[in-house]
Amino acid sequence: MTYTGVCDALRFPALEEVTGELNIKTSYVNGSFVSMLQEIYTPVLKKVGKLVLTTHNKSQESWCNNVLTNLDCFRALENVGVINIEYQLGLVSFKGLEKAIGGLTDDTSWVVGHNAYNPTFEQAKNGELEQN
């Protein structure tokens, strides 16, 4: 499932599982207009094959999402094969992924970069999920 769009909020109130990839582009550029996703709502999502949060266009920093500061929307997520979070310039807390991180087995399942906070796999496994 891939989302690339221009809405402020992405809501999946009944979504419990995505067997493949859940790929959410959190910003979208149309000409000079930049739209940023402000809210993700997935209160019962428990399982995802691969979780990807990135931007539609990485060529300019001003086109990357700077609104999302945490991943609390994924609090219910317990099982994920790969977590890939990139280009979220306001993101300072991965605490919402705490349950899912517990099930990750090696650093190849943790791809994080170009965010406001970028914990390593070891830091994430040790519970260092928020920027100090």
Question: For each predicted feature, which ranges?
Answer:
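Concave beta-strand-loop units of leucine-rich repeat
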Residues: 1-132
